[in-house]
């Protein structure tokens, strides 16, 4: 069987790979399709396996899903990288990430990341405490108080249409009306949402959570929602930072949280065409893990890789840090299947490019759950690179670093990833450096610092650092590396070591945990991003950081805010810029309002300086007030027209974008 599958150009991964069935053919809405295919049989000798799941397979998956709802299944789900139904047994209910991972003060008084999941776990950070005290005015003796656990009596009651519930039970699709399940899916990870979880509660949350296990289940759910005029809000990994998952407070209909996490399989891999067909609920880390077993990868690595899903990537037009080699999500997607109130949207073939009018994929990508549910996607894959190497470059200042990145982009020789940190972000990263166990290593670090600051004359309070990641064929990587370092030298850049580069990337997946620690000590913090033409990058970065400082001072913030940025993606015509800002809110009566007003002012400054509304976080409800201005009245009207046709009764009523 395996040899036959390989000969056909498709290799199913795991026991769940499907090749279709008679039931699939009987359900085919186009009975002439088989005849047409027979007439062009010669063109399909190397065709891909059928993607559809049979009715029996859907039933089997529902049964298996029900079995894994028990707490005993949680450790297996945790290890595999899939998201269990009871997310709260693995993940924090009021913060980022896994329950076993958080920053604490250890017995030595040093900040340490608990657990064993990350390279930084279990290591003391000897200078981080001093950094947060000096930078943010934190007094570690004064902690905030927050709810220790979720009290079901504090949550809005579940209001569900009884006729709908009766019909739902007939489908055998798993569901829950429990308070903790509903609250867990009522939010993403904006500061506002996490603050509310710690200090209060949402005004509106989903009334019921549904767990489809395949495309056909989603069709049934959408049909029932249309029948009873209910509201559906899809959720994948729950990593939204745009209020995309928050329920509209004035929604009076039953709100369904359609959780795609149990739709988490790779349906097939086509090794001839280097594509994989996957269900939308598979997480990035699980997708990469399974593909790697067969020697492949997608190369798509957003910072939320651990928890975000393929469906979420498509619906928000996501970007990954290695897009210079593999592309953004719009470059990776070959085929999308989406269930809408009008029916199923998908193309009739999986050709690499078509000239068939406006690309319907671009109606789906970035739709943010407003038109339907993405159930499956075909994405490009590549062989796992044979060689990977990190690097870093120190520049005298941020401006020269930007000029270097611009030249690298112009020559189209950017490594898989290149990130340029401003001075404050460099110092922040340096404060997260773990304790050095070797005197020799400590001596070398001191020697490098002396060389850069004293011998080369770099000002420690001005220098900027770029981290680099190269991957591919070893010989080509080494040639590529030399080319990049030669360009950097022309802009005053000095090689700063492979270890510094590697550490910068290893911090990627733990940065989000720091906000939870900050909240315990009266600090509010957030990240946001934009993209801008090259000639606007330096001014935009400076003006946004100055605006944040000015806004905080005018609003009575007693300690100067932490405001920093990095250039995190490069393009021919511009770059993506990522900002962090945080402030100590002790003495402020309404810190959340101050924070939101400051963040909005920063966004206004971005737009005034020629930046985009968003590069990859999306619009959601957080940024939709600026969407019409960003895409024009006519463009906004086009989006509304699509919404009104595809979803005339606003079944997908999360109210993102419009």
UniProtKB/Swiss-Prot annotation:
<feature type="compositionally biased region" description="Basic and acidic residues">
    <location>
        <begin position="23"/>
        <end position="35"/>
    </location>
</feature>
<keyword id="KW-0898">Cataract</keyword>
<feature type="site" description="Important for enzyme activity">
    <location>
        <position position="419"/>
    </location>
</feature>
<keyword id="KW-0443">Lipid metabolism</keyword>
<keyword id="KW-0242">Dwarfism</keyword>
<keyword id="KW-0597">Phosphoprotein</keyword>
<dbReference type="InterPro" id="IPR016167">
    <property type="entry name" value="FAD-bd_PCMH_sub1"/>
</dbReference>
<keyword id="KW-0685">Rhizomelic chondrodysplasia punctata</keyword>
<feature type="domain" description="FAD-binding PCMH-type">
    <location>
        <begin position="202"/>
        <end position="384"/>
    </location>
</feature>
<keyword id="KW-0576">Peroxisome</keyword>
<dbReference type="InterPro" id="IPR016164">
    <property type="entry name" value="FAD-linked_Oxase-like_C"/>
</dbReference>
<comment type="similarity">
    <text>Belongs to the FAD-binding oxidoreductase/transferase type 4 family.</text>
</comment>
<dbReference type="InterPro" id="IPR025650">
    <property type="entry name" value="Alkyl-DHAP_Synthase"/>
</dbReference>
<dbReference type="InterPro" id="IPR004113">
    <property type="entry name" value="FAD-bd_oxidored_4_C"/>
</dbReference>
<feature type="binding site">
    <location>
        <begin position="316"/>
        <end position="319"/>
    </location>
    <ligand>
        <name>FAD</name>
    </ligand>
</feature>
<dbReference type="Pfam" id="PF01565">
    <property type="entry name" value="FAD_binding_4"/>
</dbReference>
<keyword id="KW-0444">Lipid biosynthesis</keyword>
<dbReference type="InterPro" id="IPR016169">
    <property type="entry name" value="FAD-bd_PCMH_sub2"/>
</dbReference>
<dbReference type="GO" id="GO:0005778">
    <property type="term" value="C:peroxisomal membrane"/>
</dbReference>
<dbReference type="Pfam" id="PF02913">
    <property type="entry name" value="FAD-oxidase_C"/>
</dbReference>
<feature type="modified residue" description="N6-acetyllysine">
    <location>
        <position position="347"/>
    </location>
</feature>
<feature type="binding site">
    <location>
        <begin position="303"/>
        <end position="309"/>
    </location>
    <ligand>
        <name>FAD</name>
    </ligand>
</feature>
<feature type="modified residue" description="Phosphothreonine">
    <location>
        <position position="74"/>
    </location>
</feature>
<keyword id="KW-0274">FAD</keyword>
<dbReference type="InterPro" id="IPR036318">
    <property type="entry name" value="FAD-bd_PCMH-like_sf"/>
</dbReference>
<comment type="subunit">
    <text>Homodimer.</text>
</comment>
<dbReference type="GO" id="GO:0005777">
    <property type="term" value="C:peroxisome"/>
</dbReference>
<feature type="compositionally biased region" description="Low complexity">
    <location>
        <begin position="63"/>
        <end position="77"/>
    </location>
</feature>
<feature type="modified residue" description="N6-acetyllysine">
    <location>
        <position position="102"/>
    </location>
</feature>
<protein>
    <recommendedName>
        <fullName>Alkyldihydroxyacetonephosphate synthase, peroxisomal</fullName>
        <ecNumber>2.5.1.26</ecNumber>
    </recommendedName>
</protein>
<dbReference type="GO" id="GO:0005829">
    <property type="term" value="C:cytosol"/>
</dbReference>
<dbReference type="InterPro" id="IPR016171">
    <property type="entry name" value="Vanillyl_alc_oxidase_C-sub2"/>
</dbReference>
<dbReference type="GO" id="GO:0008610">
    <property type="term" value="P:lipid biosynthetic process"/>
</dbReference>
<dbReference type="InterPro" id="IPR006094">
    <property type="entry name" value="Oxid_FAD_bind_N"/>
</dbReference>
<dbReference type="GO" id="GO:0005739">
    <property type="term" value="C:mitochondrion"/>
</dbReference>
<keyword id="KW-0472">Membrane</keyword>
<feature type="binding site">
    <location>
        <begin position="234"/>
        <end position="240"/>
    </location>
    <ligand>
        <name>FAD</name>
    </ligand>
</feature>
<feature type="transit peptide" description="Peroxisome">
    <location>
        <begin position="1"/>
        <end position="58"/>
    </location>
</feature>
<feature type="region of interest" description="Disordered">
    <location>
        <begin position="63"/>
        <end position="86"/>
    </location>
</feature>
<feature type="binding site">
    <location>
        <begin position="368"/>
        <end position="374"/>
    </location>
    <ligand>
        <name>FAD</name>
    </ligand>
</feature>
<feature type="region of interest" description="Disordered">
    <location>
        <begin position="1"/>
        <end position="41"/>
    </location>
</feature>
<dbReference type="GO" id="GO:0071949">
    <property type="term" value="F:FAD binding"/>
</dbReference>
